């Protein structure tokens, strides 16, 4: 496999879509790991009690755009009735601190009274999206950004193929993917009825799935699995499964979630960081750009422990290469930007910029990551001048 970048004679791309190129993503999953046991990351990270301080801390680090989540399960506890007391303080605090938010409407969670497999799920989600958009318009929010459903592909696999979290199903991933696409499209249309100028960041993992050199017969299967990562975006764009209602104008901004372990050999063998088969990020970005010609955001990226600073350096260098090729990368968002007790195994998340809060509500800054962040912010500002 060639790792050489494609020839591109276009001028360097100058990002301008968001308030800041470097951004922060708050942990805001509300998945049920087991039936009846919901893990609310906005709560467990302390973010719900520290909104003002957290947004101010991002502003201090020049992270003026952030991804954060509306907790649908709290807002619509009673079918058709919306209680905004968990959400309005977020809107107000972000406005005071001048932080631009990309709002997630469903991050692996939904109200207990809904059955995700039923048509009513899509209908409720559409009404919720419309109500949320109307609330934000009433609050005077201009040029809003939304993510209707976070990581459709990952949720479909984790929730309906391997039963890792809700809806706790097996071998129904494609069915859930189609349902989540229906819900996303319904939300996009509902929000646009209120906010024609709204923009949508549609997130999913960006991965490389390759055949192992010792197993050349697996190449067609690896290639097929690699291509499957694009299926949800293709559905949203109406390129496949047209009966779902997708269209090209619904595929807006691609949100790419990218981590060190996003490379593996078919079917599930991890690929080491120094494996020669590993395709650099800028090549994966070029492939995505060639396929969709849409603006892209590295919507989540980060590494654990001492690797977090060099990882950001590597990501930034790859994104710089992509920008030089004329590829529309609009930002890099650090995840998690604040620490939380990890939802998969009850560890503390080891990769944040800001640690768990002390009794006074203060979070320690990870100095080496902050230094690399500041260095890259200066470099990218100079490049974009």
Predicted regions mapped to residue ranges:
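Non-catalytic scaffold segments within catalytic domains of secreted glycoside hydrolases
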Residues: 2-49, 55, 59-61, 73-385
